[in-house]
Amino acid sequence: VSGRLEGRVAVVTGGGDGIGAGVARLFAAEGARVLVAEIDEAKGRAVAEEIGGLFVHVDVTDRDQVEGMIATAVDTWGSVDILVNNAWGGANLGRVEHKTDEMLHRGFAMGYYGPFWAMRAAFPHMSRAGWGRVINMVSLNGVNAHIGSLEYNSAKEALRTLTRTAAREWAPTGVVVNAIAPGAKTAALQRRIAQNPDIAAAVDAANPMGRLGDPLTDIAPVALFLASEDCRYVTGNTIFADGGGHINGVAWAPELPDAPAG
């Protein structure tokens, strides 16, 4: 282990499972002090204890909790150098015409407003230090308009726009902002596979490498690069860490219910 993040303070939302847990583990192994922000207290505490980090219970749809998360990192360690916006709570599978206002509001609260609030709260600390790294987890689903998950697709594409806009505005301050579109065994996908095991085979078959990525060994190293000193001249990008899946697009489609999503 090279200690590429030695002395840095990292905040990882959704850090109790899947990609977030993989990122938290690798960042800690590389020397960072990691705040694990998670709505599932048992999972979040377990990861934080494992890596010697700090757990904070956070619902990213609550602005006060998100701002408090950043304040806790600063109060505890004096700074926040790295922010990974990863948390997501799932979407209601259904056709566009069956989506409700509440579904869209919740999707944007999780996938757009939560990251925005965290970025807004973290930026003053990063800019004063003249150094900062923001990593937003986005999705190929938004790029290729995967059917059935409008609120997820839309929020993730809005987050890509936020990524590029912040990257342009914040570049003079030493704060770089990038996104990762992972093709990985996320917690949400695992839940969907549990309900419909055929999805796993379909997703693997559609990938040029024949498999989904592992959060720790395939996705977290990309986040490590974006969080490191090596990323000083890289900003406003989306990296597709998906085994080439973006070349094929989303080649599988779920069966959508005829009735409105519940």
Language model features with spans:
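Short C-terminal tail/terminal secondary-structure segment
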Residues: 2, 93, 235-262
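Conserved glycine-rich cofactor-binding loop
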Residues: 9, 16-18
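Conserved mid-core segment of classical short-chain dehydrogenase/reductases
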Residues: 67, 90-105, 128, 148-151, ...
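Catalytic Tyr-X3-Lys loop
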Residues: 97-116, 131, 135, 152, ...
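C-terminal substrate-recognition "lid" of short-chain dehydrogenase/reductases
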Residues: 116-119, 131, 212-241, 246
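Active-site helix of classical SDR
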Residues: 119, 155, 163
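Alpha-helical segment proximal to the catalytic Tyr-Lys
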Residues: 124, 168-172, 232
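Residue(s) in the substrate-gating loop at a strand-loop-helix junction
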Residues: 139
